[in-house]
Amino acid sequence: MEFDKQFFSSVEKIVELAEQLEKDLNKPDLTFEQIKAINKELKHKQPLVVKFKEFKRLIDQALEAEAILENNELKELHDEAKKELERVRSVVPEYEEALKLLLLPIDENNQKNVIVELRPAAGGDESCIFLADLFNMYRNFCSNKGWKLQINEMIPSSVGLNFVSFEVNGVDVFAKLKFESGVHRVQRVPATESKGRVHTSTVTVAVLPQLEAVEVHINPADLRVDTYRASGAGGQHVNRTESAVRITHLPTGIVVSCQEGKSQFTNRDTAMKMLRAKLWEKAQNEQLSTQAGLRKSQVGSGDRAEKIRTYNYPQNRVTDHRIKLTVNKLNTIILGDLDEIIEALQADEKKQQLENFFS
């Protein structure tokens, strides 16, 4: 029976270690933190253990079939044994690939909710208009996924948006939206263009995981909290109370603000979420400057030539330059139909992880 015996042996050892961890849970002297750590590891390893046991049963069945074929006294069973052997051979590559994927390290941020920030870059007014288009695209995408989108801060311009920050809560939010970080480029004829020339503009998108307070320590003494009257939509209430909150992290100079909530308490809570995300980003940027998801490596300067994706309106085309994927249905993508692009990016991420892990 042909299969990767070295790989099989390596996975078997990992499974044996997981089974030993399960036994360790019965030790009476474990601390709460040790139990928590073991359970976390077992939760991560459980899918691998289950898949490997299925694979091992198949290999055992194949070896048994080979033994029957080598025994001339069991010729009446040879036909069935051949069928069994062929069946197992046909699924071995599928199982080996599945096990490899289960061996990959899990990005714990994938399950987290996110904070998304959109800023106009090159292109003036057209960039602000495109920013509003992208915001609507993400709003529709989130609605289609059943995710909750909440605006933290929105600054309108005369023709579109100058800035928007929003949080998204749901299942596997960061796992999907993290690929949106970077420079998005649009090519189209602006409504104000009288000669029909195509203009190029860009918007930068940053996607940050929402972190719990225990994940990012913030000393209250390092904060300056200012309150002010909210502006914009919200009715008379926003003009009567100082519900808007601005928080400055003095050691880093990072400033966050929120005015979309109805109360100062709500806005402060949201602003603290934003601050934790920005401090996480700063720490990651300093320690792992090449890690995916960082604004410095993903967003860049916003220059027209520096982009992750292009939206070409005249050709109804969207091209993701990271994986050289072109989809000719911009008209539906800009309305929130992002699944095809995101699924392709996820597949490429897994491919790259496999190559790096087993190289």
From Swiss-Prot:
Modification after translation (UniProt): Methylated by PrmC. Methylation increases the termination efficiency of RF1.
GO MF term (any one): translation release factor activity, codon specific
Top-level taxon of origin: Bacteria
GO annotation, cellular component aspect: cytoplasm
Subcellular location: Cytoplasm
Bilayer-spanning residue ranges: none
Keyword terms, alphabetized: Cytoplasm, Methylation, Protein biosynthesis
Keyword Secreted found: no
Pfam families referenced in this protein's UniProt entry, alphabetically: PCRF (PF03462), RF-1 (PF00472)
Modified residues (N5-methylglutamine): Q236
Matches recorded under HAMAP family: Rel_fac_1 (MF_00093)
Protein family (similarity comment): Belongs to the prokaryotic/mitochondrial release factor family.
Role: Peptide chain release factor 1 directs the termination of translation in response to the peptide chain termination codons UAG and UAA.
The name this protein goes by in its record: Peptide chain release factor 1
Origin organism lineage: Bacteria, Bacillati, Mycoplasmatota, Mycoplasmoidales, Mycoplasmoidaceae
Gene behind the chain: prfA
